[in-house]
A protein has these predicted regions:
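Active-site recognition of the HExxH zinc-binding catalytic motif
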Residues: 64-76
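Metalloprotease/metallohydrolase-associated module, dominated by Zn2+-dependent proteases
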Residues: 1-61, 77-123
């Protein structure tokens, strides 16, 4: 089991695709390049339609990072980041996306039944 988990976290391995709006976004692994604590765990590249996630993350950080980057994709594809819109400044976007991600992750962790319920209701 442990070996399988390590294999899943290899650099360059495409985990899956996620549909965000009209785009199919590839989710891939990338070797950690952290040089300071403020470096990010992941990145959404709207030009390439790729979400990159660092390989050295715990399962919880990996889930949080993926949700965080998906929310960046939703904000971008729905034009919330263009001039005059609520998230038109990078600082505003990051604060809002981070707070919503962390809030949702806490709700999901505290209410284990919720994701299954939502999945069942959206068939």
């Amino acid at each position: 089991m442990e070996k399988k988990k390590k294999e899943e976290k290899k650099e360059g391995k495409i985990l899956e695709k996620v549909k965000i709006g009209y785009q199919d976004v590839v989710i891939e692994r990338e070797t950690s390049t952290f040089s300071k604590q403020t470096d990010s765990y992941g990145e959404y590249d709207h030009r390439k339609n790729i979400i990159s996630i660092q390989t050295e993350l715990s399962d919880l950080d990996e889930a949080n990072t993926l949700l965080h980057e998906i929310l960046h994709g939703i904000a971008y594809i729905n034009s919330l980041t263009v001039g005059g819109m609520p998230l038109d400044k990078e600082e505003k976007e990051e604060i809002v996306i981070n707070q919503i991600t962390n809030g949702l992750m806490q709700v999901f962790r505290d209410n284990k039944w919720l994701l299954d319920f939502l999945k069942e209701k959206t068939k």
